[in-house]
């Protein structure tokens, strides 16, 4: 049998053509400790802070502590499949989450994985969870209002698009209700809402989602949930994941409202991780960089300049206080980062004043510039009315022989408190808020009994919807008050038809 050189060369060429170089170089280390949501590994000498690493079982982790001998890693998910001695390799990537319109209407975990049983989220866009906040020249001042639908907020502590407004109060004072009502009120406002539930019970999150769905608000809302049974790393990452999802819309010229409910639990999760990673504890055992934990998150909320599309992200961070102590470490940190705070008072809540907003300690540092002109006009005296009422109320309990001016202030104060009450999940459009506050500040409610205020208000709205829709539309479209003669005449017309209760 003769060997032909051509056949051999053809065979060698074919072999060379089919050869694939599948050699890859991975930098791998060895797990030396695993437990409590963290792992330690040595051999990853070139790992970067915040870099994703992959364990043998496919679980990902994030490098946090870079020490001379080993790397402290927080594990993103269950750590049950990871053993001491397993290998762990660098990925060269930082953590990213899925983003885009496909997430709207879904409930996802902080990794962007759906947990609502409605199938996978079909998006191929991702964004890093950590991103540098827009700089000074990339922003513009807050000029557009964000209507919450709650009279007490829109009149006394107005919020603008791009603002950070802290909602602070003890547990069970209606903080989550403020968030849900604000989201419901964004319907038809060209706003995308993101509700980040951190450490909230799964049953509570489910109730909130059902409420949003009932009012049609899930059509423009993303819910990011990290329940109390989630590992601490997921509770720590949840707000950053929500911010990354919001930035996708903000940088595309859209308006976003993001609610962090609540950042106290995120700080607790971060404290837990830091102590397990053996970082030195500081005040209240929080690590030294707990201020930076919240500042780098909240600075990502902004009103972007027109060159960048003019989009905005408004943040409503929540903080839970213990026995009304706003001077604790985390509350004072977040108060100093945000553009104002809404303080919810448990005494007011239990006395039936809901939403339980304390007008004396609540403030909005930039929202006044964004307030509708009509609202600014009618709400101008509200804060002073409430302040003088609360001052006089304590004196009034000791005696009834008060002069007429004091009695008038007390009567106006009682009616102001009553007008600012609002039922759950019934946010009001701004024109109706302006209408009832106009009636209050111009003395039309002074002859009405305090118990009749809310029925009077409901009747007034129905009457204007039926007979004076043009006046309401004028407020809604122009943001200014109609001619006072017309408005006064219309309110007097209604007052003549109002039937007071027989009490």
From Swiss-Prot:
Binding annotation for ATP: 169-176
Site (Required for activity): residue numbering on this chain: 362
Catalytic reaction equation(s): ATP + H2O + 4 H(+)(in) = ADP + phosphate + 5 H(+)(out)
Positions in coiled-coil regions: none
Annotated membrane topology: Peripheral membrane protein
GO cellular component, one term: proton-transporting ATP synthase complex
Domain of life: Bacteria
Keywords: ATP synthesis, ATP-binding, Cell membrane, CF(1), Hydrogen ion transport, Ion transport, Membrane, Nucleotide-binding, Translocase, Transport
Locations listed in the record: Cell membrane
InterPro entries found in the cross-reference section: ATP_synth_asu-like_sf, ATP_synth_asu_C, ATP_synth_asu_C_sf, ATP_synth_F1_a_nt-bd_dom, ATP_synth_F1_asu, ATPase_a/bsu_AS, ATPase_F1/V1/A1_a/bsu_N, ATPase_F1/V1/A1_a/bsu_N_sf
GO MF annotation: an example: ADP binding
Enzyme Commission (EC) number: 7.1.2.2
Task performed by this protein: Produces ATP from ADP in the presence of a proton gradient across the membrane. The alpha chain is a regulatory subunit.
Subunit structure, as described in the record: F-type ATPases have 2 components, CF(1) - the catalytic core - and CF(0) - the membrane proton channel. CF(1) has five subunits: alpha(3), beta(3), gamma(1), delta(1), epsilon(1). CF(0) has three main subunits: a(1), b(2) and c(9-12). The alpha and beta chains form an alternating ring which encloses part of the gamma chain. CF(1) is attached to CF(0) by a central stalk formed by the gamma and epsilon chains, while a peripheral stalk is formed by the delta and b chains.
UniProt family annotation: Belongs to the ATPase alpha/beta chains family.
Protein name according to UniProt: ATP synthase subunit alpha
Organism: Ligilactobacillus salivarius (strain UCC118)
């Amino acid at each position: 049998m003769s060997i032909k050189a051509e056949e051999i060369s053809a065979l060698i060429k074919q072999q060379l053509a089919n050869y694939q170089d599948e050699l890859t170089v991975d930098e791998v280390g060895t797990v030396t400790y695993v437990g409590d949501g963290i792992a330690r590994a040595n051999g990853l000498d070139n790992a970067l802070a915040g870099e994703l690493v992959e364990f043998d079982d496919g679980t990902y982790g994030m490098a946090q502590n870079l020490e001379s001998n080993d790397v402290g890693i927080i594990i993103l998910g269950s750590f049950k499949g990871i053993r001491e001695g397993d290998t762990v390799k660098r990925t060269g990537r930082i953590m990213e989450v899925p983003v885009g319109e496909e997430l709207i209407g879904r409930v996802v975990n902080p990794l962007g994985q759906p947990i609502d049983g409605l199938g996978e989220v079909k998006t191929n866009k991702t964004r890093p969870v950590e991103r540098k906040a827009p700089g000074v020249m990339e922003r513009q001042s807050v000029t557009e209002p964000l209507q919450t639908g709650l009279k007490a907020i829109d009149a006394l502590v107005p919020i603008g698009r791009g603002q950070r407004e802290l909602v602070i109060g003890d547990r069970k004072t209606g903080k989550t209700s403020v968030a849900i009502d604000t989201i419901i009120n964004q319907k038809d406002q060209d706003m995308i809402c993101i509700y980040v539930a951190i450490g909230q019970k799964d049953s509570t999150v489910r109730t909130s989602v059902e409420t949003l769905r009932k009012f049609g608000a899930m059509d423009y809302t993303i819910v990011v949930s990290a329940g109390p049974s989630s590992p601490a790393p997921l509770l720590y990452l949840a707000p950053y994941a929500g911010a990354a999802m919001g930035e996708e819309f903000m940088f595309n010229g859209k308006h976003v409202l993001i609610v962090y409910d609540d950042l106290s639990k995120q700080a607790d999760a971060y404290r837990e991780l830091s102590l397990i990673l053996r970082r030195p504890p500081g005040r209240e055992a929080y690590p030294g960089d707990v201020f930076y934990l919240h500042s780098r998150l909240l600075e990502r909320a902004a009103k972007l300049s027109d060159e960048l599309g003019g989009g905005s992200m408004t943040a409503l961070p929540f903080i839970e206080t213990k026995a009304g102590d706003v001077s604790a470490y985390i509350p004072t940190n977040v108060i100093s980062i945000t553009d104002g705070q809404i303080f919810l008072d448990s005494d007011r809540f239990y006395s039936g004043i809901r939403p339980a907003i304390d007008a004396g300690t609540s403030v909005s540092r930039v929202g006044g510039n964004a307030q509708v002109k009509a609202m600014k006009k009618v709400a101008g005296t509200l804060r002073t009315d409430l302040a003088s009422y609360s001052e006089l109320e304590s004196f009034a309990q000791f005696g009834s022989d008060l002069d007429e001016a004091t009695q008038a202030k007390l009567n106006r104060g009682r009616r102001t408190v009553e007008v600012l009450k609002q039922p759950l999940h019934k946010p009001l459009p701004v024109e109706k808020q302006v209408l009832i506050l106009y009636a209050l500040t111009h003395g039309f409610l002074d002859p009405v009994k305090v118990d009749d205020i809310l029925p009077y208000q409901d009747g007034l709205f129905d009457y204007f919807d039926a007979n004076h829709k043009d006046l309401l539309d004028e407020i809604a479209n122009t943001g200014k008050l109609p001619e006072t003669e017309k408005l006064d005449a219309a309110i007097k017309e209604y007052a003549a038809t109002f039937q007071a209760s027989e009490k």
